[in-house]
């Protein structure tokens, strides 16, 4: 798909495999029951879009960004979220995650202060050098998910399981854990 501008549109039950979205700008769009496998965002922007019951696997990006996107009941595999911050990194690529399943995701140097991951499944993923102050991971399945040099002060990990924390490199003051 090349050089498209779409605003306020709804896309349903679409499947893209190996597609490159070049110069595309999606604003306030809804993607429902869509699948994106091995796709690439190249010089593209997603702004305030919603993804409902979608699957996104092996997303690659070049000079692209996402701003304030919402994901609900989605499966998100092998995504490097920092690559979606674009230059400047002033806007968060993710506004919310609700009832999502993430595997092999990487969050690097992101500000996720007070972010609500609660109830999500985040497996075999990595948070590196992130600000997770007051983030909520309550009841998350975090199987083999690692936290490296993160600021996790006041984060909530009650009833979360499977995570690995770099206790010497992470700030953990007042974080809440279940024993």
Each model region followed by its residue ranges:
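Tandem repeat scaffolds
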Residues: 1-179
